[in-house]
């Protein structure tokens, strides 16, 4: 029975390999998340700069059009305001959000697996120590029995 358990259970080296792979996955997911956040922030910054540029152009054209009739200025404003609102909102693309979410899920999965692998290690270590302590206590009892009752008297 003990031979079967040794074949089925992972060795210490295998556990270390699993932990190393999980740590590499964590680093990859974290780097991916940081990169995606940087990309989305750059996109927002670019969008903000474009919105400011559009607003400045709108102001300059409004000042130039002051000499024209007020109806033409009012009809031009709603279109430009809608364009500037769209650019100001500037949400990050959906693929960036999807990749960030996927990276977060991978990160959480890796952290859970590290905890599980570490608990396997501690369980196996405690089982080994319990078996060793049991064996040493049996040896101690045998030696005490021999000291108290010599073998010649036990055979009688």
Curated annotation (Swiss-Prot):
Residues annotated as transmembrane: 18-38, 98-118
Keyword Transmembrane helix in annotation: yes
Alphabetized UniProt keyword annotations: Host membrane, Membrane, Transmembrane, Transmembrane helix
Membrane disposition: Multi-pass membrane protein
GO terms under cellular component: host cell membrane; membrane
Compartments reported by the entry: Host membrane
The keyword Lipid biosynthesis belongs to this UniProt entry's keyword annotation: no
Stated name of the protein: Protein U91
Encoding gene (name): U91
């Amino acid at each position: 029975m003990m031979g079967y358990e040794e074949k089925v259970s992972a060795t210490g080296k295998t556990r270390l390999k699993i932990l190393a792979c999980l740590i590499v996955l964590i680093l990859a997911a974290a780097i991916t998340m940081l990169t995606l956040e940087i990309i989305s922030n750059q996109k927002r910054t670019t969008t903000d700069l474009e919105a400011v540029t559009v607003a400045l152009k709108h102001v300059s054209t409004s000042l130039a059009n002051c000499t024209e009739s007020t109806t033409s200025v009012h009809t031009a404003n709603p279109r430009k305001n809608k364009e500037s609102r769209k650019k100001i909102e500037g949400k990050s693309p959906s693929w960036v959000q999807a990749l960030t979410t996927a990276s977060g899920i991978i990160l959480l999965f890796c952290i859970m697996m590290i905890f599980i692998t570490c608990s396997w290690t501690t369980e196996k270590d405690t089982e080994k120590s319990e078996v060793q302590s049991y064996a040493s206590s049996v040896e101690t009892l045998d030696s005490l029995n021999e000291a108290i009752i010599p073998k010649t008297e036990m055979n009688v």
